[in-house]
UniProtKB/Swiss-Prot annotation:
Comment, domains: Contains a PML interaction motif that allows the subnuclear PML localization.
Region of interest: Disordered: 22-112
InterPro entries: Adeno_E1B_55K_N, Adeno_E1B_55kDa, Pectin_lyase_fold/virulence
Name of the protein: E1B 55 kDa protein
């Protein structure tokens, strides 16, 4: 420890006198500097309260002690002398300086800026602008011809301050810069076929309108090969505080490789033909919604921590998707074909339970929910892997056969009309539980939010276990038959 009242300022206990330090050799000078560094680090590890440290530093400054500045550990950190800084930052092997803080680039987008410049300067076979194609297709004959392809249209590189709607109407082929951040502050109406390449750019939805992108009915325009719909690809959408719908489409829409993060409402609402492929949905309320008479195609998409993944009221095709930590992966009200998907239920954390009033009864939304309908057929449900999920099956026409589905730790709720119309012959059924709903207990109703937007009272169902009544006898029906394997190539 240092003496309480040192007579020589700046020289700690154990050091030589100041006159002798000036005449010492280089090795002794370096040893003294290293000793000073160890003493400084030792003083910074002293466990002092903030009050004691403040009083001690004030008293030390008044008594002639060397001042010290407070460090992150709560103690005093001695200011380094220039000689000590050179010793600590000099490498012993290479001789170069080390431990020196270098200024970081404030933007941090050097790589993305280089990528943007590389994409903008790349040579492409682009020869004609969109307005030139429009001017050539004025008459009735040329408007039906496909004279140009997408590769021949010139690209308009959109800046963050540009108007999206005007650029789409005038250029049709749009590209975003990956080093820029775009913000949507008003509704964008799209009335012509277009091709928008995002290049991984981030688009923040910041508007009070009901829909951010409204894909309206398209007029008669000259055809371009490869641009027959409204196409958006490789765009990252964020909805910080946005409570509306991102895409409302009543025309043909293609979303390719986009990601949606943190939307409190519907991401894609389809009233026409919509194709969603290779997209990712993170922490969204409703990812995709196919309304009545819509044709929704969802392929190779990922749903994570969403409340409702796919809402289907019309026609839907769901292929090769993955869902995890999603309360309801698909709610089938219309006709659907669900094949080759991997559905993982929620973890130990219990999600918020919503209702659905479709089918005449208010039931808790299951991970896979099939609504009962007196005239609709069962959905095609094949080759799916379901783990730690719940299924709700309502009554429909025909027989429901989840062919070659792996149901591991799955609880299936069967409505009374669906009990005799479900066959679990061709599935992996070791850890499946089948329950039949007998009636609804109206003594303890609970009011919950519904997927329709309102709130309803939910009555507790009274169920009975019917697993062994529906499970086939595997000693009679062997698993070596043609149901679980075939010599031919399985096709989608």
């Amino acid at each position: 420890m240092d003496p309480p009242n040192s007579l020589q300022q700046g020289i700690r206990f154990g050091f030589h006198s100041s006159s002798f330090v000036e005449n010492m050799e280089g090795s002794q000078d370096e040893d003294n500097l290293r000793l000073l560094a160890s003493a400084a680090s030792g003083s910074s590890r002293d466990t002092e309260t903030p009050t004691d440290h403040a009083s001690g530093s004030a008293g030390g400054a008044a008594g002639g002690q060397s001042e010290s500045r407070p460090g992150p550990s709560g103690g005093g950190v001695a200011d380094l002398f220039p000689e000590l800084r050179r010793v600590l930052t000099r490498s012993t092997t290479s001789g170069q300086n080390r431990g020196i803080k270098r200024e970081r680039n404030p933007s941090g987008n050097n790589s993305r800026t280089e990528l943007a410049l590389s994409l903008m300067s790349r040579r492409r076979p682009e020869t004609v602008w969109w307005h030139e194609v429009q001017s050539e297709g004025r008459d009735e004959v040329s408007i039906l011809q496909e004279k140009y392809s997408l590769e021949q249209l010139k690209t308009c590189w959109l800046e963050p301050e540009d108007d999206w709607e005007v650029a789409i109407r005038n250029y049709a082929k749009i590209s975003l810069r990956p080093d820029k951040q775009y913000r949507i502050t008003k509704k964008i109406n799209i009335r012509n076929a277009c091709y928008i390449s995002g290049n991984g750019a981030e688009v923040i939805i910041d508007t009070q309108d009901k829909a951010a992108f409204r894909c309206c009915m398209m007029g008669m325009w000259p055809g371009v090969v490869g641009m027959e719909a409204i196409t958006l690809m490789n765009i990252r959408f964020r909805g910080d505080g946005y409570n509306g719908i991102v895409f409302m489409a009543n025309t043909k829409l293609i979303l390719h490789g986009c990601s949606f993060f943190g939307f409190n409402n519907t991401c894609v609402e389809a009233w026409g033909q919509v194709s969603v492929r290779g997209c990712s949905f993170y922490a969204c309320w409703i990812a995709t919604s196919g309304r009545v008479k819509s044709q929704l195609s969802v392929k190779k998409c990922m749903f994570e921590r969403c409340n409702l993944g796919i809402l289907n009221e019309g026609e839907a095709r769901v292929r090769h998707c993955a869902a995890t930590e999603t309360a309801c992966f698909i709610l089938i009200k219309g006709n659907a074909s669900v094949k080759h998907n991997m559905i993982c239920g929620h973890s130990d954390e219990r999600p918020y339970q919503m209702l659905t009033c479709a089918g005449g009864h208010c039931n808790i939304l299951a991970t896979v929910h099939i609504v009962s309908h007196a005239r609709k057929k069962w959905p095609v449900f094949e080759h799916n892997v379901i783990t730690k999920c719940t299924m709700h099956i309502g009554g429909r026409r025909g027989m429901f056969m989840p062919y070659q589905c792996n149901m591991n730790h799955v609880k299936v709720m069967l409505e009374p009309d669906a009990f005799s119309r479900v066959s679990v012959t061709g599935i992996f059924d070791m850890n499946i539980q089948l329950w039949k709903i007998l009636r609804y207990d109206d003594t303890k109703p609970r009011v919950r939010a519904c997927e329709c937007g309102g709130k309803h009272a939910r009555f507790q169902p009274v169920c009975v276990d019917v697993t062994e009544d529906l499970r086939p006898d595997h000693l009679v029906l062997a698993c070596t038959g043609a149901e679980f394997g075939s010599s031919g190539e399985e096709t989608d």
